[in-house]
Amino acid sequence: MQDAENVAVPEAAEERAEPGQQQPAAEPPPAEGLLRPAGPGAPEAAGTEASSEEVGIAEAGPESEVRTEPAAEAEAASGPSESPSPPAAEELPGSHAEPPVPAQGEAPGEQARDERSDSRAQAVSEDAGGNEGRAAEAEPRALENGDADEPSFSDPEDFVDDVSEEELLGDVLKDRPQEADGIDSVIVVDNVPQVGPDRLEKLKNVIHKIFSKFGKITNDFYPEEDGKTKGYIFLEYASPAHAVDAVKNADGYKLDKQHTFRVNLFTDFDKYMTISDEWDIPEKQPFKDLGNLRYWLEEAECRDQYSVIFESGDRTSIFWNDVKDPVSIEERARWTETYVRWSPKGTYLATFHQRGIALWGGEKFKQIQRFSHQGVQLIDFSPCERYLVTFSPLMDTQDDPQAIIIWDILTGHKKRGFHCESSAHWPIFKWSHDGKFFARMTLDTLSIYETPSMGLLDKKSLKISGIKDFSWSPGGNIIAFWVPEDKDIPARVTLMQLPTRQEIRVRNLFNVVDCKLHWQKNGDYLCVKVDRTPKGTQGVVTNFEIFRMREKQVPVDVVEMKETIIAFAWEPNGSKFAVLHGEAPRISVSFYHVKNNGKIELIKMFDKQQANTIFWSPQGQFVVLAGLRSMNGALAFVDTSDCTVMNIAEHYMASDVEWDPTGRYVVTSVSWWSHKVDNAYWLWTFQGRLLQKNNKDRFCQLLWRPRPPTLLSQEQIKQIKKDLKKYSKIFEQKDRLSQSKASKELVERRRTMMEDFRKYRKMAQELYMEQKNERLELRGGVDTDELDSNVDDWEEETIEFFVTEEIIPLGNQE
């Protein structure tokens, strides 16, 4: 039978080597390896393929090729079943061999067929021996023609396949039939109201209404004692999957103030009953000292840091911002694979890698935490820096969502995974100002989750038909969303207080095309930019609906503009906003002020501006109007306290503008990602005075390191502003010292060098005088230390220089 095997498989192997057929690979790809059936079938095929090269028979019919279907592999891996197993090498149609000898108890007819099979195998084996010499003679001719034998891909004789079926076919084995005793579909619900017979039917209706959402309920049982229910019930579903879904979604359901359901699977009781009574003391984890993660805030000169990516992303550096030249803190090659991002308070630096995200911090920027998420592309931090949201476009499964994952930054543990719709916009989850809530919008639904449980608020989502967009207030747990018109129902903007879900303001709007929500940084105001088409008119008119959030009943003021709106931006710490409107080349910028009496006043309008973006200083008052990319980098620095243009400049082809956290400096840059030449970043003062031009090879990105909110109260800040003149004298003195610091260091260095030279010269002179007697002895008593010590040895030479005299008249001579 072994000889039969050595003949059968080579025919199939050489059939696969025909032109147009798939050639065998040296090492199969991982996907093919996963589909390779485990057990005796795989090593057996490998062994017979090795023998094909030894025999050298090249006659096989087209039917000898072997293909193992995935379904057959699954059946083979799943163990014994009624369906036949995949054919072995002896059963191949083109091998001229019958199945192996049956075991005891098989049909006699099959034994007869086996005897015929043995005789045929012996004949073929003898024929193979006769052909061995002919194959050896044909080998040189085959090498000359380039027809060499295929390489051997067989496993060695001592090879042991230690890969289990679960590793290879885990996804298939997961769905194989399993024995069930029926209790997998039963759940136990605790904290159910205890009622008597008169209210039992009503309770059953309520329970059925709640739990029938998860599947068909086939049976229920309400235990009673002393004429009342015991406070727990049993429900049986038609499928175990429905029971699992009920536990997942109904556990913690709040029926009323006194009753919150606790739902468990009935099978959980066995699991908890088998817990060992012996408690193993957990191993104490050593404390990992990460150092001072906010050390940069204690810098004596109060300088800020920023990150720079250059050389097309191959190098990343961290710098101190210095007026003269940036001071490098850390520089690493291939620190990130795409880009970097700072956390909201500047504690962590996030770098992107194919396998996940890494967080860095501390004085030496050591790795603080890492999160494994294959193919991650986008991230988002919670405002409190406690949670990290990562997104990967790789496919995820229905049972285990992996597209979006929320992580606990402190522990590094995964909190929850979510699916992601392809039409969503990042960030998909938007956080409340304190990180206690986060929300996402799907079709006709607004889902609000709470931390740290990561579950739905009140265990249910908000059904909002047609919801288009939403946004959290930066100053409180208030969420704003808008809904478009639906037939005769007007569009509306709604402000909702959370977690109570109370609607504190609703604004109806008509003839609406689109809405954009713009919050002021402190949450004092909300501007809803409404594009609408009034009846009887052509074109689009824009209304700015200003909600004054700090006043009773949230009054709304309206500013209407008939020109095209290019950009809108609130002053971060104030009540002014700026609007870019018009069309090139007639672009104007208007500055408005929201007064306490509710009146919105136009402060100033500048015409003929080359700008398409508005960048407010983080501290307010100052603003940069920038014409990025297509507008060739035109810059205008404006002081909105008196609405004066402090300076007009240009950074050709600028693609980005970044204010530092203090509002003292601003950076304009040309990124290699958007423009392939003139890549650099320039540092300006808030007044528009250029300080530095830093050219970096293939510069990509610059990001300032954020600062956490100040610990000072508003009263303390007011007092500091009142005493600013006293502090300004100290700052001016430090500035003068810093300006002369470089010259002082140079003078001090030169003075030190001169002093060292004088010491060395004195030491050399002393040594020279000590060696004078030795010199006299070596030179026969002749003193050569002085030039006039031996006049007889002098030679006098006279050198003449020819000097010509030329007279050049100066001025006019009459």
Curated annotation (Swiss-Prot):
Superkingdom field: Eukaryota
Predominant localisation class: cytoplasm
A GO molecular-function descriptor: translation initiation factor activity
RRM domain mapped to chain residues: 185-268
WD repeat extents: 285-324, 325-365, 366-425, 426-489, 490-553, 554-598, 599-642, 643-685
Region named Disordered: 1-158
Ranges of compositional bias, category Low complexity: 32-55, 71-95
Comp. bias intervals (Basic and acidic residues): 134-144
Listed GO CC annotations: cytoplasmic stress granule; cytosol; eukaryotic 43S preinitiation complex; eukaryotic 48S preinitiation complex; eukaryotic translation initiation factor 3 complex; eukaryotic translation initiation factor 3 complex, eIF3m; extracellular exosome; synapse
PTM notes: Phosphorylated. Phosphorylation is enhanced upon serum stimulation.
Modification sites for N-acetylmethionine: M1
A GO biological process held by the record: regulation of translational initiation
Modified-residue entries (Phosphoserine), positions: S78, S81, S83, S85, S119, S125, S152, S154, S164, S239
Pfam families according to UniProt: eIF2A, RRM_1
Alphabetical keyword list: Acetylation, Cytoplasm, Initiation factor, Phosphoprotein, Protein biosynthesis, Repeat, RNA-binding, WD repeat
Functional summary from the UniProt entry: RNA-binding component of the eukaryotic translation initiation factor 3 (eIF-3) complex, which is required for several steps in the initiation of protein synthesis. The eIF-3 complex associates with the 40S ribosome and facilitates the recruitment of eIF-1, eIF-1A, eIF-2:GTP:methionyl-tRNAi and eIF-5 to form the 43S pre-initiation complex (43S PIC). The eIF-3 complex stimulates mRNA recruitment to the 43S PIC and scanning of the mRNA for AUG recognition.
Domain observations: The RRM domain mediates interaction with EIF3J.
Similarity-based family: Belongs to the eIF-3 subunit B family.
Name under which the protein is recorded: Eukaryotic translation initiation factor 3 subunit B
Organism, scientific name: Homo sapiens (Human)
Upper classification of the organism: Eukaryota, Metazoa, Chordata, Craniata, Vertebrata
Gene designation: EIF3B
